[in-house]
């Protein structure tokens, strides 16, 4: 037993496993809250119901793999049977194709139906908003989830869906747990220390927007999991397999194709190895995207579909969504994703507040600067900073690695002030301070910047050129790159605490880390849907 405990204590992944278990427990604690679709879940859950009922998908603008995870959850949690059940009721009047919104509908027996149920009549989904058993009437919201408002001649059978939130969201929660594991493995394959990797993974796991989105029945969740799998396989050197994962990411949601940009940039900057295997990655991604598309489309379309025609349909549908023709408060240009800090409510009570944790969002720009500094150490003598200062210089950074040099314009050069707290010489000129280091380039810094470029910076010229509408939740796959930078930075502060014997700098470093982590958890507690579940009236009031 002692030997087992000793091995467990030395096992690298014990804290990662604990983190995954905690996150899964929190997700499953609220997976059924609310028991109705939240935000864009409505589109994908409705489409899953359409597919299950034997009809062709209504959301042809998206690839099908992400939808199949929702469909699979419905089947598994309904005993591998369709959750669509005949109610015993039929329609008692004509329904016109021009009558949308809420309307009264006479049925054969209203007592068989309940308020809040989703029903399907032919191919049209409706939500029951009220019932009147005495008059055998129900009030329905027509065209639910974008299904076509159609003409219905009585009597038509009314079916109700018996699926629930657990079946819709189950695979999103499982895939999000897999994403946490993959993210940690990515950090380790970037030569980050165990501590830095765990810090980054902790920050990502309890980042509000990531947690919120990871528990929703959305296509982006499965797409991100395959993206992270592609990154991990690439960093391990499994190039062809990485290309297949990129294809699967794009088959879940087209945005997943951006993963190949991050991989290509990193390979060109850092690796440039095994060129033919890397060419295999670049070739496998589009080839498997096309080859696997008919398989993923077969059930949603209930037949074989030409993948090239599907691709053209998706691209045309995407191109038609521009800022010029899409209204509402949700569309935002990419620059607003990181500089607009307002909350976007998806649902109230429990509150689904779509906002990147401020502990992360406020530091996006500083973290990018830090990552750039770490990434640019491409040679053994990298000039970390060049700052022009007045003639008096106080060397308050004496413990930084490297040497501090005070260099004057020619002919005087190389006046060295290394490792001293003395005031700089009284000279009348302006000097240049340089910190000379011996670090090589930092692979994690470079990869995080490539990741950020592919999933965020790409959208800036794309929107400028095409006017393609974008939404703030498009930042979801980018957050991991920022957490890598935060993990690296905080690990350096912890190391500074360890190497310093005493002094204010020692305790300041560890205080920054502790305060930040507590603030990060506090924001998560106050903003996540979990607050409503465990927090009582105080936290509910704070969120209202």
Language-model features: where?
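Autoprocessing Asn-cyclization modules and mimics
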Residues: 82-153
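Transmembrane-lumen/periplasm boundary regions of multi-pass, lipid-linked membrane glycan transferases
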Residues: 267-368, 373, 377-381, 415-418, ...
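Short acidic/glycine- and proline-prone juxtamembrane loop motifs at membrane-interface regions
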Residues: 38-39, 209-220
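Transmembrane-helix motifs of polytopic, lipid-linked glycan transferases
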Residues: 21, 166-191, 198, 229, ...
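Perimembrane helix-loop-helix junctions
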Residues: 1-5, 235-236, 241-242, 246, ...
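Transmembrane helical bundles and short interhelical boundary loops of multi-pass, membrane-embedded
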Residues: 281, 321, 389, 393, ...
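Short helix- or helix-capping micro-motifs
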Residues: 20-23, 200-205, 232, 246, ...
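Specific aromatic-rich, kink-prone transmembrane helix
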Residues: 222-241, 245, 481-485
